[in-house]
């Protein structure tokens, strides 16, 4: 935190340390006197972002550039970081350039907004002006994208995936999943939501096979699913495919797009070359990718195109179940919505089931039929989307829903004000006691 300040001789080391402790305290970091003694791997993602805010503010700059500081954070962590950033900007008088693809977040932080597209300014104005009366079609699309929601479908009678009393751990002393029971019907979507560390991705690892459960049973399409990946048949492996959060890590940079998509066709079905070419062309059409991308490499594609390639490759195996692990978290809203629309259309045409993992409750509203809310390795709320997202709520689900940024300027200010009022009330109560 103090490295740049001391390096540029803006403060003495002792002064910089004192300033860092002040900022740690102000930004709500735990044990501020000793927080600076920790290493980055010893703190959470939200604490790291607040520490980086302290680093940026340490030398009292005139301008701080925030480049997507909350994109990878879950909603409850995100709101704490946003509150810290907003307070820091207001208290220090520092100007801020806040870069984000999430308009709901921008609505809480910014005074003015500039909308960019393809390197050019589309529109600029005050927050109220952009949200209440956007002039350009692109801006209107950005504002409207979070307002879409689909109705839950009537629950199908046939189960594809049944998870019964599953527990799992990475070592005997650290249980990660405890007594998970869920059911996913054929052709439907079960969304798994929760904070980082709640066990969402671990559950996906258990279903897909790399992590064996310590207790419980999983049934897939009517038969018991072997816990070990090595014991699963080739047919079972084909029927359970995954779309990862980071397509750059999932795609081989040395293979062309045609090679990447055709690989499952050769591996699972032994298709000859001509048949593979025809099947790849059909998958390209299904995922709405330009045909001229087939001979290109992943580095030559946009983020949305890479994710579509991942979807095409997964669909090449003709699976019954797709595990979607945060597939849109790194994409801007319009690209993310296009991916979600693609997944909805593919599901309608192929009747593929989705286990959809996300921390974004706005996405859940647009994709899910059923929802399971996870907290500290357990399911705390589970059912049809309408039931889970309607009151009465358990405390944790209420916290998650209350932390989703709203497309309403001033929403975060209201939360800060309520917290301050609650703090004052608690202080007065303690003094009377």
Segments and roles (model prediction):
Residues 15-34, 275-292, 402:
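Conserved ABC ATPase "signature" region
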Residues 30-36, 127-164, 173, 385-433:
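Short catalytic/signature loops enriched in Gly
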Residues 121-125, 133, 379-383:
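ABC ATPase "signature
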Residues 216-225, 236, 381:
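Conserved ABC transporter NBD signature motif
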Residues 208:
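Helix-to-loop junction immediately C-terminal to a conserved catalytic motif
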Residues 60, 318:
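Conserved catalytic motifs of ABC-family nucleotide-binding domains
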């Amino acid at each position: 935190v103090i490295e740049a300040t001391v390096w540029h001789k803006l403060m003495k080391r002792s002064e910089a340390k004192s300033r860092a402790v002040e900022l740690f305290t102000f930004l709500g970091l735990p044990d501020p006197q000793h927080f600076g003694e920790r290493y980055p791997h010893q703190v959470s993602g939200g604490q790291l972002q607040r520490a980086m805010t302290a680093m940026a503010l340490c030398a009292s700059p005139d301008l701080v550039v925030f480049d997507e500081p909350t994109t990878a954070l879950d909603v409850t962590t995100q709101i704490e970081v946003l509150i810290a950033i907003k307070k820091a900007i207001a208290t220090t008088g520092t100007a801020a350039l806040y870069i984000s693809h999430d308009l709901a977040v921008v609505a809480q932080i910014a005074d003015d907004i500039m909308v960019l597209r393809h390197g050019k300014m589309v529109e600029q104005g005050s927050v109220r002006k952009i949200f209440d009366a956007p002039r350009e079609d692109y801006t209107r699309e950005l504002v409207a994208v979070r307002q879409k929601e689909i109705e839950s479908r009537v629950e199908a009678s046939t189960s594809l995936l049944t998870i019964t009393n599953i527990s799992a751990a990475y070592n005997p002393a650290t249980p990660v999943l405890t007594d998970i029971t869920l059911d996913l019907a054929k052709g439907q979507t079960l969304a798994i939501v929760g904070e980082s560390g709640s066990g969402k991705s671990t559950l996906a690892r258990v279903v897909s096979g790399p992590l064996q459960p310590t207790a419980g049973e999983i049934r897939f399409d009517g038969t018991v699913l072997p816990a070990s990946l090595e014991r699963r048949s080739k047919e079972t492996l084909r029927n359970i495919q995954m779309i990862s959060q980071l397509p750059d890590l999932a795609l081989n940079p040395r293979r062309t797009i045609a090679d990447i998509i055709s690989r499952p066709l050769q591996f699972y079905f032994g298709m000859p070359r001509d048949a593979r070419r025809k099947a790849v062309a059909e998958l390209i059409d299904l995922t709405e990718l330009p045909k001229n991308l087939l001979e290109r490499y992943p580095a030559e594609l946009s983020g949305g195109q890479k994710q579509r390639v991942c979807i095409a490759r997964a669909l090449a195996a003709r699976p019954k179940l797709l595990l979607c692990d945060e597939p849109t978290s790194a994409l801007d809203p319009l690209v993310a919505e296009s991916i979600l629309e693609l997944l909805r259309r593919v599901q309608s045409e192929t009747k593929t089931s989705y286990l959809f993992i996300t921390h974004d409750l706005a996405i859940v509203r647009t994709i899910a039929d059923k929802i399971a809310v996870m907290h500290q390795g357990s399911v705390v709320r589970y059912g049809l989307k309408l039931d889970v997202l309607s009151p009465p709520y358990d405390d944790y689900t209420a916290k998650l829903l209350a932390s989703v940024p709203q497309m309403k300027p001033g929403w975060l200010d209201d939360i800060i004000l309520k917290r301050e009022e609650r703090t004052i009330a608690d202080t007065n109560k303690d003094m009377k006691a």
